[in-house]
Amino acid sequence: SYNLKKNLKIRANIISRKLNFPLRFFKGLNICDFACGTGDNAIIYGLNKANVKGFDFNSESIKISKKRIKNLNLKNIKFTVADFYKIRGKYDFVSSTAAIHHLENPLKGLNHLKQRVKNDGFLFVSFGLRTSNIQHALMKIAVRKFGQKDQQIYKVSKKLFPNHIKRCVFYGLRKESNVIYDQFVNPQHNYLNLNQVLKTLGKNFILHSSWPKIFIPSGDSAMNDTLENYQFNKFFLSELYWSQKNQDDKTIINNTKSANYEKAFYDLSNLLNNQNNFKYFMNLKFEKTYDIIDLLINDPIDTNYNLDKSFKLFVKEIKIFMKSIKNDNLSQMSNKIKTFDKLFKGTSGLGLNYFIFQKKER
């Protein structure tokens, strides 16, 4: 059964900790939640004393939302059935999570959202990226080889991807039928290209935070940040990682870390630090320093977490699966999937990316 209290706690943690937006900042804000569903995010805003309007086209979802705020005695939230593009006005904080990739034209939807944000206001969105969802897109294509009707899709998806469905149920706090509908049956999964997202938002929208966080080589002095005004794709390395992802981050780090290598690295820095007496260093520190350097050279650890090697294996398995889509029957495809080491394992990519942008007039 759906545990509202647990889900609110998880979602509040995403906003406050993962996305660095303290919940106390919601106090007094006028907020609009587009495609609010059953109202979880809107309730979080309302519990933190914001004035909230939640809209969704689904009357059943709105009915559930209204029941929840009645039970919680929240008078500062109003839920209304409305079409996405009919919602007007400007707000301090606009949100729409796990929704716009289901629109026929997601970028048109994003453009509509950005127009609803006041200057100095915030836009909170989550959606599927095309790169993060390469594996999900392949799943959907494969399932449709064996039938287009809903019941056929339910049956085939459970045959081909049972572990993926179970994982989504467990971590997504959803029913199996809802997971299968959203992942496989729903005809509209128009995932977004992140560069197009940033272009649509324009220079007035500054990235406040994202989850997962992006990772790029960053080691310039604060006085000489060469990347500050440099135009390049800051998300490329992250998107490569998200696309092939098949394990939890903790597992990947545990499998590629070396306590000996870490110790040797820090020992090297300690041995070289503050050595003002040359003779003392040469007599007592030089040989040990030399040995540590050899250890660092010869240790087989891959400090990039084997990402390049892993990605090459990942795309090789995609090539094998493409042949399976073309030639195999259901049983053959199911058996082929079981032989993969990277593809369709564990997390199978990344379903949703979260972003908070702030609007700044320039």
Residue ranges: model-predicted function:
Residues 73-84:
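Conserved SAM-binding strand-loop segment of SAM-dependent methyltransferases
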